[in-house]
């Protein structure tokens, strides 16, 4: 078979055939969507009520079952004299985290809830801040400590015994992990930008170590530089740091705050798909971190509505109007803003499969069989022309909305005994500039799972199914959907495989890209 090398400047000339949204995108032109994003009008997100209390802080030690303790700050409603108000109030573990440097920030943010009648606890995980021990992020020990913290707060004489937990990133991870441990007094959680599985989301993406986490490891938990490297396969070490392995135990009401640009969007969506009867999903136009600092439409009022409902016993406090509240990115401008759906992917979404073709195009019709090849990039620089394959659709005459995950099913032969496949989707503008939409990665020896490596026989064709993380993204008319296939995607994954060549089957009986799309 002929081997064709593709370059970044290669453009397609073929139109897309077949049914579905992309076919319509190549039909007669239609008017563009109205300028400006759809606003978030659901009353849940504008909920608020007046503050009634002041705030008093107590520096405490939370006792643990093994005789150790955790340092924490307990913020309680205060009366007019500045003393703790008489009565009992529901409790929120506002952050259970290893980020001791942020304690004052957390305390200031927690005060919003304290002034409205909640106790709020900011807790330093074992080995962080003033808590003795060694940080072992999201470990079974840390989960036991978190369980003990919730039960301690429930027994506090100023608490009703109804406890919630919330947090961003580290605190979001701990919120989900403690929930599947089922402490008796935990009633609901709000995890923001959080995991479903520490191995898959963060450390070994598709079985490939992610270098972007190493600086975090060095600064937060240096011992993990050795322990994580010692567990390249999915074993009990990782099962103990996973929500996924215990999805059946995620039974408390869960308000997931996800970002479509966030590094944990795949995990947040997977949690929802696994437990749709217990999870409400909010996915917005933000990256990793606190959404309130990136987007003015998400504030503490929505969280207060959640706590008033599940901890305060107010059955009139609103819930989100739909199970899924999602911002169609990019925006403002290209994306249409907020939408609400009863499920994810949306009910009107459907799968569309495109073929990777010899001329560098993506189309529903596969065309002739063939091969294309690229060289393995063993460095950290972006791949050059010979180290990647590029495929793209024709220019779209109508908008196309991606609403869900995607899968690259690739037939590949490796000249070495292992290899990596990185699949990156881009929005290509008429001037040729590309905007990254989403991506997925897979080590060839992990093509049958991460628990046991599968042999990679040099020169033999292997079928790999690369999961591409979900998105809710509008590709505008006049743009193209572009797919880059290579061995690297630094800093998302390490370039950790031997030098060599990867040959990819294209055209009929070759590689395909399955998309989830909805009508624009």
Walk through the language-model features, giving the residues of each.
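C-terminal segment of N-terminal export signals and the immediately downstream linker at the start
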Residues: 6, 27-50, 410
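N-terminal export leaders
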Residues: 10-14
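Short, polar/charged, Gly/Pro-enriched helix-capping and turn/loop motifs at alpha-helix termini
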Residues: 20, 27-28, 160, 313-317, ...
């Amino acid at each position: 078979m002929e081997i064709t090398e593709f370059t970044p400047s290669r453009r397609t000339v073929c139109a897309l055939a077949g049914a579905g949204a992309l076919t319509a995108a190549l039909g007669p032109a239609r008017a563009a969507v109205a300028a400006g994003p759809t606003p978030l009008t659901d009353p849940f997100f504008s909920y608020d009520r007046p503050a009634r209390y002041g705030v008093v802080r107590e520096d405490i030690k939370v006792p643990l079952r093994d005789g150790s303790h955790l340092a924490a700050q307990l913020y309680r409603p205060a009366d007019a004299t500045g003393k703790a108000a008489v009565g009992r109030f529901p409790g929120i573990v506002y952050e259970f985290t290893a980020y001791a440097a942020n304690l004052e920030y957390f305390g200031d943010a927690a005060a919003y809830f304290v002034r409205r009648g909640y106790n709020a606890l900011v807790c330093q995980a074992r080995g962080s801040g003033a808590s003795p021990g060694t940080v072992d992020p999201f470990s079974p020990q840390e989960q036991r400590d978190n369980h003990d913290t919730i039960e301690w707060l429930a027994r506090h004489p100023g608490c009703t015994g109804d406890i919630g937990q919330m947090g961003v990133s580290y605190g979001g991870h701990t919120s989900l992990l403690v929930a599947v441990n089922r402490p008796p007094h935990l009633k609901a959680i709000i995890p923001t930008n959080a995991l479903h599985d520490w191995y898959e989301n963060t450390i070994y993406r598709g079985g490939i170590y992610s270098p972007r986490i190493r600086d975090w490891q060095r600064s937060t938990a240096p011992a993990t530089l050795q322990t994580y490297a010692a567990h390249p396969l999915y074993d009990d070490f990782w099962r103990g740091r996973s929500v996924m392995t215990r999805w059946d135990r995620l039974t408390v009401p869960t308000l997931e705050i996800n970002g479509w640009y966030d590094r944990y969007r795949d995990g947040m969506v997977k949690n929802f798909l696994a437990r749709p009867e217990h999870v409400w999903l909010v996915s917005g136009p933000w990256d990793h971190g606190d959404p309130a600092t990136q987007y003015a439409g998400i504030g503490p009022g929505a969280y207060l509505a959640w706590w008033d409902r599940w901890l305060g016993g107010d059955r009139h406090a609103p819930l989100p109007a739909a199970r899924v509240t999602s911002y169609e990115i990019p925006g403002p401008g290209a994306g249409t803003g907020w939408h609400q759906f009863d499920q994810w992917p949306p009910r009107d979404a459907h799968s569309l499969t495109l073929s990777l073709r010899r001329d560098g195009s993506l189309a529903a019709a596969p065309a002739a069989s063939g091969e294309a090849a690229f060289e393995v990039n063993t460095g950290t620089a972006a791949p050059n022309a010979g180290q990647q394959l590029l495929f793209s659709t024709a220019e779209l005459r109508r908008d196309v909305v991606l609403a869900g995950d995607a899968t690259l099913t690739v037939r590949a032969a490796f000249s070495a005994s292992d290899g990596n496949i990185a699949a990156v989707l881009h929005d290509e503008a008429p001037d040729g500039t590309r905007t990254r939409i989403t991506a997925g990665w897979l080590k060839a020896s992990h093509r049958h799972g991460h628990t046991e490596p599968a042999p990679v026989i040099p020169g033999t064709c292997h079928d790999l199914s690369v999961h591409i993380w979900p998105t809710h993204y509008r590709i505008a008319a006049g743009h193209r959907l572009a797919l880059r296939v290579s061995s690297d995607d630094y800093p998302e994954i390490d370039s950790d495989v031997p030098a060599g060549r990867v040959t990819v089957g294209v055209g009929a009986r070759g590689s395909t890209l399955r998309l989830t799309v909805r009508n624009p």
